[in-house]
Amino acid sequence: MKYKVLILTHGKLAGSLYDTVKFIYGSTDGLAYLNMPEPFDQSTYGKMIADIVSENKEQGTLILCDLFGGSPFLTSARLLKENGDHMELVTGVNLGMLLELMANIESAGIKELKDIALSSGKDGIIDMKERLGKQ
């Protein structure tokens, strides 16, 4: 299966985000996830990620991680050095970001998907008191 977007997080958050996208959006075509294996083994985890990136070299892969500096991010950042031409990496994955990506996953390339992830991630953080005060 070809994937454009790969969710990587600590624990089982990646799978929960995936399941929630499927519940809300219906389709998860082009979306994949890897839960962090227990016990954690950097080498095994890195190989699992590398295999998905390698299988999708033609279209590329956008990797979404939960935290900058965490194990999913650090493992992916190492791969980015080797696969920069067909891989993008963004941290701060959230449900709103994933839903926006799913709406564009078939038509957009990974660089455009990266831009969508960045803007929707930032735009989805709202201070409601501030917003109400401006209206």
Describe the residue ranges of each PLM region:
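N-terminal loops that bind phosphate or other acidic moieties
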Residues: K2-T91, L95-Q135
